[in-house]
């Protein structure tokens, strides 16, 4: 199962104007599993090709995590972003392993993933680094 913030699902803000928007990915999103979208605005689940069903969660990160764990069974729950969503789960101590892919590209100001978060203080340490041609993959474990 996956958990995404609303911005990762789409560009629409506020109330859903209609049911036309079904995500950035077309009819067959890359998740192929139950995917829980954090939002303040309720919406009926959307079943897509390939096994993805988007569920819209309005009662917080804990509720989304509980539903994702129930849906995943013995499999992992993956937090797919964006930055605000990952930050909330880091601060809640709900992420056991964080896989970062750092690319040498200047994208602008953006949002800071780790601003004012004491990763060592939360128990995280670097357990793996893998340099590749296009990125360095860093695994943090708690």
Regions found by a protein language model. Give the residues of each.
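Enzymes that bind and transform nitrogen-containing heteroaromatic metabolites
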Residues: 1-142
């Amino acid at each position: 199962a996956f958990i995404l913030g609303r911005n990762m699902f789409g560009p629409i803000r506020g109330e859903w104007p209609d049911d036309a928007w079904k995500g950035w990915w077309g009819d067959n999103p890359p998740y192929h599993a139950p995917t829980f979208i954090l939002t303040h605005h309720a919406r009926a689940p959307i079943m897509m090709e390939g096994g993805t069903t988007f569920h819209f969660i309005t009662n917080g990160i804990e509720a989304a995590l509980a539903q994702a764990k129930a849906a995943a069974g013995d499999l992992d729950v993956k937090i797919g972003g964006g930055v605000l969503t990952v930050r909330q789960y880091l601060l809640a101590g709900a992420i056991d392993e964080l896989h970062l892919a750092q690319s040498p590209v200047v994208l602008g100001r953006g949002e800071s993933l780790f601003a004012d978060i004491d990763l060592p203080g939360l128990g995280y340490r670097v357990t793996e680094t893998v340099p590749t041609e296009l990125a360095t993959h860093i695994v943090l474990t708690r």
